[in-house]
C-alpha cells in the first residue's frame, strides 16, 4: 500500500487540535539489545489512554470535512470505543458504542 506524504501531513493537521503530542524517548535498554537506536512513543499518555484515538479522530474528521457523517458507531469495549466516542464529541456528532 502506497501512502503519499501529503496524506500523512493532512492526517497530522486533522489530529493536531484533538490529540496530545506525546513524548518520544530513546530506550537505552532496547537500543543496546538491538544495536540500533530504539525510541518509545508514550501513547498511554494520550487523552484516551491509547493510540486508538488517532485512527478514529482522523477518520471522523475526514468524514466531517466532506459532510459524509451524521453519527459514529463503534463495536468495541476498549480503546477503540474510547477513541471513537472522544472524536465524536470533539466533532459534535452522536456516537453509538456497542
Regions found by a protein language model. Give the residues of each.
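PLP-dependent amino-acid enzyme catalytic core
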Residues: 1-98
Amino acid at each position: 500500500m502506497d501512502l503519499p506524504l501529503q496524506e500523512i501531513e493532512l492526517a497530522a493537521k486533522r489530529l493536531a487540535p484533538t490529540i496530545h503530542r506525546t513524548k518520544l524517548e530513546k530506550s537505552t535498554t532496547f537500543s543496546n539489545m538491538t544495536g540500533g537506536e530504539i525510541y518509545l512513543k508514550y501513547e498511554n499518555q494520550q487523552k484516551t489512554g491509547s493510540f486508538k484515538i488517532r485512527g478514529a479522530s482522523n477518520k471522523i474528521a475526514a468524514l466531517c470535512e466532506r459532510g459524509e457523517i451524521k453519527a459514529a458507531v463503534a463495536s468495541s469495549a476498549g480503546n477503540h470505543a474510547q477513541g471513537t466516542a472522544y472524536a465524536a464529541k470533539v466533532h459534535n456528532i452522536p456516537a453509538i458504542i456497542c
